[in-house]
């Protein structure tokens, strides 16, 4: 028995550059982008971001195969395999936020599942069930070109984000789970005695380097242009925020 399924779900269009009723100021946003491109060129970098104007989407491809085999009247064997490939794009803008294309990221999750079972009957009072399974999961975020995250607030009544999304610059999780279980059941009168074992082996690889290429946050366009033009007041004290809920983070506001 086999099965294949494909699903694609487009969702409403985000607000983009020049969108009507958007709270951010598109003209000021373009000035900020032009200043960043000019700064990159002066540093010898070829960096040309563009404004994002994409639909949000969710896609998935699924496939499965199952085989049942009656070996004989005392033994039955089954094996099944399933596969799920799911994708969705995140990091889109809103009515009050405008982002570049490399701020968007695609979250992709691929899962393979393999399971096998052997049922054996040795006598009217003695039977055995053996099971094995393997689950392979690969979760990954696909980010844009290597570039820092630059966020400027109070651009009109919204904010502008240029560069990569801070938590997607290096983010991935690999999981491999092996399971073996065997149960021998002995029927004795009105009683059933089960002797067995259950074993699981896990392997995880987690990549998470937030703000790998750097992150810069500005309270206003004027603060941003002051830094770019070298006219910022260096006597200001930087503010920090530290939190601890399972992890610690530190952010600097310029």
List the predicted regions and their residue ranges.
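Short, small-residue-biased leader/transition segments that mark boundaries at the very start
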Residues: 2-9, 252-254
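Glycine-centered secondary-structure boundary/capping sites
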Residues: 3, 16-19, 36-46, 141, ...
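Surface-exposed beta-strand-turn/loop segments characteristic
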Residues: 11-59
